[in-house]
Amino acid sequence: VLAIVCDGMGGHQGGDVASTMAVTHLGHNFSMTDFADANLAHKWLDVQLNSENETILKTADKFPDLNGMGTTIVLAFAFDKNALIAHLGDSRAYSYSEGKFVQLTEDHSLVNELVKMGQITKEQAKHHPQKNIITQALGVSSTIDPEFDEIKMGGNDIILLCTDGLTNSLSDPQIQQILATKELSLRERCNKLISEANRLGGGDNITVCLIWNKEDESSDR
């Protein structure tokens, strides 16, 4: 299973084009593969992301109205009892396992760099005037350095992929509480995350994807 979430930037049209290109091209190319190995997937994804970065840059150069377009990307390749995570930008991946909610990715953003340098706190970063400045994305620079992480997936573990529209509106404890609601199906939990983020003032596009390693039906994701 390959799940991808993108958040376009560079104007309404440009952002939509860049994010659609990334999801469509990677999804199509993945459908023609048959590997189930993290090392092969890592190499394949690295090549694909660099190729897509070049394609978006060339498309933006060809069409003036798309100049400056780009997109964040976060993806998860789930196989057997493992998952390979890759990302560029501030769209995030989380895991929910045995009651623990863990952020798997580190934002490629200016404010996160300031937090790491100790110049601002995580709380200050949430409201910083430059919080939307991204340091890595597809289609922004001729070179990219995607980050990869491999995790184990136990029975009933959930991986959450999301744009910053969700995390700007809901805190980690609020997200965790919804994911922990076993009475809700996976789709219902996904819909509730989005509706709660909108209810609490979500002014940005909100995209959420959940991958569930369901214990009794491992293919139900």
Predicted features along the sequence, with ranges:
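PP2C/PPM-type serine/threonine phosphatase catalytic domain
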Residues: 1-221
